[in-house]
């Protein structure tokens, strides 16, 4: 069996430098050179997964086809690689310890004392190897920053794994910050030198250094970093702030990043075909048209909470050669504002998903305004559920209509807690209000059957069914379906009796879906629901 080659990506100085984007960019170049590539994110935090973490704490939770709740970097990986990943592509310290403790309880360690070395480190190595099976190259991003206590077992694992597979089968890339000091008017390399020194103390010497910076690094500065950090001069790569993250692979390519990678990993001459990517990036940066839509959500102070959705909108804009300007609307503040004033300058209204009652009435207000004023509307997940609540209250005149998530005692729960459903493996799942929150939602890709000649069918190019990803605990109550449809709110998507999509038959574009279309959108393959909504907003603007 052919040996998988590994590229380990670590970060220094501080977090949020963009290790995920750098890793995804390198993966894109390698894939477009004809190699089979995958990426793994190893997160040192002790949560089993990010599923129960606050969006303000950790940003978006990205969901894979197989229902894994993962780090938002997996979204970047999928969007750059244009491939679906799985739960094998993300794990945490919590998951590792959980697995080791379960094995110990089953007696698999034959009574031995369980220690970080070899047991925890061995589990990390096994998970890395599993993710790389059948691939030419696996890129492994280690979350956090070198020097974090939580990250030490992961760094020890990649140090040991490199020795195990041999020098031509693994390399280390270290991403670091080269800050620009305005008072001095110059870039400083000392944080990079200290970060590499910290990495070396752990036993890892980087083969390549990627320097994040506000400004370009001149040749002398790159040479200084190379000499002080012990890497070849062509292995110091700059990663300057860019207008779009999708420029990064092209920027790396201009610096010939693949030549030293090919040399270190003993690969053939790598020549990626990036023509299509390049043309799409040009349309992202300098589109011909412009349209403004309102993005209504409760986490708008932290845009990372909606990362996949904002990226999907960029993809749609590139496909339609249009810059989509987002007007961020805090749904909680909207409750005390005039809808007409807030939405007077937009050509579409998007109501995003979320959890909890805060901001719900503001979202309902936005939906009512879109419905009554015939402005293109897209509701996603909670956005669909609240479209049902709004319609029930204002059209069916069920004034107490609500979701049982927000009012367990309401007389007209048009959205309710589903207690039984089949999961992605075809197994029956049972839920109650007291079921633990972690990993217990309806998660992953499910088939949605589409009503013929509907708006949903139109956006999916008359497909009879599609598979889209879900992350929710509450469902539309089928008891109210007949009344909804009698008054013009049509069910256009279903999954084994569960309502997946609704639309208004007397509106230019009013579509609400229970699934998350943004999770399957890619730069080179935009999701049809997002694209259809942006196209409707453009038509509204033109007319």
Curated annotation (Swiss-Prot):
Q: Where does CTP bind?
A: 15, 148-150, 188-193, 224
Q: What is its EC number?
A: 6.3.4.2
Q: Which Pfam families match?
A: CTP_synth_N, GATase
Task: State one molecular function term (GO).
Answer: glutaminase activity
Name the residues that bind L-glutamine.
354, 382-385, 405, 473
Binding annotation for ATP = 16-21, 73
The UniProt entry's GO CC annotations, sorted and at most eight, read: cytosol
Query: InterPro entries annotated for this entry?
Result: Class_I_gatase-like (IPR029062), CTP_synthase (IPR004468), CTP_synthase_N (IPR017456), GATASE (IPR017926), GATase1_CTP_Synthase (IPR033828), P-loop_NTPase (IPR027417)
Q: Which residues form a coiled coil?
A: none
> Domain Glutamine amidotransferase type-1: where?
292-543
UniProt activity-regulation remark:
Allosterically activated by GTP, when glutamine is the substrate; GTP has no effect on the reaction when ammonia is the substrate. The allosteric effector GTP functions by stabilizing the protein conformation that binds the tetrahedral intermediate(s) formed during glutamine hydrolysis. Inhibited by the product CTP, via allosteric rather than competitive inhibition.
List GO BP terms, alphabetically: 'de novo' CTP biosynthetic process; pyrimidine nucleobase biosynthetic process
Residue positions binding UTP:
15, 188-193, 224
Q: List the disulfide bonds.
A: none
* Residue numbers spanned by region Amidoligase domain: 1-267
Enumerate the residues binding Mg(2+): 73, 141
Query: What's in the misc comment field?
Result: CTPSs have evolved a hybrid strategy for distinguishing between UTP and CTP. The overlapping regions of the product feedback inhibitory and substrate sites recognize a common feature in both compounds, the triphosphate moiety. To differentiate isosteric substrate and product pyrimidine rings, an additional pocket far from the expected kinase/ligase catalytic site, specifically recognizes the cytosine and ribose portions of the product inhibitor.
Q: Which proteins does it associate with, and in what oligomeric form? A: Homotetramer.
Q: What is this protein called?
A: CTP synthase
- Source organism of the structure: Campylobacter jejuni subsp. jejuni serotype O:6 (strain 81116 / NCTC 11828)
């Amino acid at each position: 069996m052919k040996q998988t080659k590994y590229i380990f990506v670590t970060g220094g100085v501080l977090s949020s430098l963009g290790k995920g984007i750098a890793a995804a960019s390198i993966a894109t170049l390698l894939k477009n050179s004809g190699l089979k590539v995958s990426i793994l994110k190893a997160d040192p935090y002790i949560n089993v997964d990010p599923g129960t973490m606050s969006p303000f704490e950790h940003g978006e939770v990205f969901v894979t086809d197989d229902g894994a709740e993962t780090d938002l970097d997996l979204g970047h990986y999928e969007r750059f690689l244009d491939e679906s990943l799985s739960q094998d592509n993300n794990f945490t310290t919590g998951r590792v310890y959980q697995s080791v403790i379960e094995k110990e309880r089953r007696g698999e360690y034959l009574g031995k004392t369980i220690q970080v070395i070899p047991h925890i480190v061995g589990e990390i190595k096994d998970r890395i190897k599993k993710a790389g099976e059948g691939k030419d190259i696996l890129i492994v991003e280690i979350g956090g920053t070198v020097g974090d206590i939580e990250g030490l077992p992961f760094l020890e694992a990649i140090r040991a794994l490199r020795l195990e597979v041999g020098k031509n089968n693994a390399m280390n890339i270290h991403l670091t910050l080269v800050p620009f000091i305005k008072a001095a008017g110059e870039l400083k390399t000392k944080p990079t030198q200290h970060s590499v020194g910290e990495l070396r103390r752990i036993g890892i010497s980087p083969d390549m250094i990627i320097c994040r910076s506000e400004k370009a690094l001149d040749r002398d500065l790159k040479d200084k970093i190379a000499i002080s950090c012990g890497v070849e001069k062509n292995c110091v790569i700059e990663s300057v702030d860019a207008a779009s993250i999708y420029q990064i692979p092209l920027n790396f390519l201009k610096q010939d990043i693949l030549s030293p990678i090919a040399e270190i990993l003993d690969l053939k001459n790598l020549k990626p075909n990036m023509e299509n990517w390049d043309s799409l990036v040009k349309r992202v940066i300098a589109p011909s048209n412009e349209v403004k839509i309102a993005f209504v959500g409760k986490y708008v102070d932290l845009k990372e909470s909606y990362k996949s959705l904002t990226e999907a909108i960029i993809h749609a804009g590139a496909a339609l050669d249009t810059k989509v300007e987002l007007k961020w609307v805090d749904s909680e503040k909207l409750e005390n504002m005039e809808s007409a004033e807030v939405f007077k300058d937009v050509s579409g209204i998007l109501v995003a998903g979320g959890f909890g009652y805060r901001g719900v009435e503001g979202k309902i207000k936005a939906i009512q305004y879109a419905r009554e004023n015939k402005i293109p509307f897209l509701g996603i997940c909670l956005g669909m559920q609240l479209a049902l609540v709004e319609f029930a209250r204002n059209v069916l005149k069920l004034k107490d209509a609500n979701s049982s998530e927000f009012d367990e005692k309401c007389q007209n729960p048009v959205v309710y807690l589903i207690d039984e459903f089949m999961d992605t493996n075809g197994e029956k799942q049972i839920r109650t209000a007291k079921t633990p929150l972690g990993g217990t939602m309806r998660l992953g890709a499910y088939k949605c059957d589409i009503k013929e000649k509907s708006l949903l069918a139109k956006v999916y190019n008359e497909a009879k069914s599609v598979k889209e990803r879900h992350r929710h605990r509450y469902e539309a109550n089928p008891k109210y379906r007949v009344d909804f449809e009698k008054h013009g709110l049509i069910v256009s998507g279903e999954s084994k009796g569960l309502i997946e999509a609704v639309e208004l038959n007397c509106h230019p574009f009013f579509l609400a879906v229970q699934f998350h279309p943004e999770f399957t959108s890619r730069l080179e393959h935009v999701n049809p629901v997002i694209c259809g909504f942006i196209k409707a907003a453009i038509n509204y603007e033109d007319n």
